[in-house]
Amino acid sequence: MSAEYGQRQQPGGRGGRSSGNKKSKKRCRRKESYSMYIYKVLKQVHPDIGISAKAMSIMNSFVNDVFEQLACEAARLAQYSGRTTLTSREVQTAVRLLLPGELAKHAVSEGTKAVTKYTSSK
């Protein structure tokens, strides 16, 4: 596991370096990923199993790819109906179109549950 889990840094921040140095080092830009969330889900499902950095990278690429496919499909659906705003309806339809059978049903129910929880907390 790397030090990136659970830590946030303000964009454009100094990253803890002193400004007194004459030589300016290249600023370390934080790379956003789903690693922390993938790891948490893994521990919920299989608490005794770990994951290698290579496998984590593959999983992160997979999540990014699925997210991009869903976003593109939802945007296409909104465009077809002449709308400029993505709603949960477009996202739900995109999930039904892209994911197979039982996986789509579970994804829709979990998504509905998450939206309900979010709206009730406001």
UniProtKB/Swiss-Prot annotation:
Cross-link (Glycyl lysine isopeptide (Lys-Gly) (interchain with G-Cter in ubiquitin)): 31, 117
N6-succinyllysine sites (modified residues): 31, 113, 117
Modification type N6,N6-dimethyllysine: residues: 54
Molecular functions per Gene Ontology: DNA binding; protein heterodimerization activity; structural constituent of chromatin
Cellular component, GO annotation: nucleosome; nucleus
Location of N6-malonyllysine modifications: 113
Modified positions (Omega-N-methylarginine) in chain numbering: 83, 89
Glycosylated position list: 109
Residues the record lists as N6-methyllysine modifications: 43, 105
Residues found modified as Phosphoserine: 33, 81
Ranges of Basic residues composition bias in the record: 20-30
Main location class: nucleus
Sites of N6-lactoyllysine modification: 40, 105, 113
Residues annotated with N6-(beta-hydroxybutyryl)lysine modification: 31, 113, 117
List of residues that carry N6-crotonyllysine: 31
Keyword Hydrolase annotated: no
Residues where Phosphothreonine is found: 112
Keywords: Chromosome, DNA-binding, Glycoprotein, Hydroxylation, Isopeptide bond, Methylation, Nucleosome core, Nucleus, Phosphoprotein, Ubl conjugation
Biological role: Core component of nucleosome. Nucleosomes wrap and compact DNA into chromatin, limiting DNA accessibility to the cellular machineries which require DNA as a template. Histones thereby play a central role in transcription regulation, DNA repair, DNA replication and chromosomal stability. DNA accessibility is regulated via a complex set of post-translational modifications of histones, also called histone code, and nucleosome remodeling.
Name of the protein: Histone H2B type 2-K1
Organism: Homo sapiens
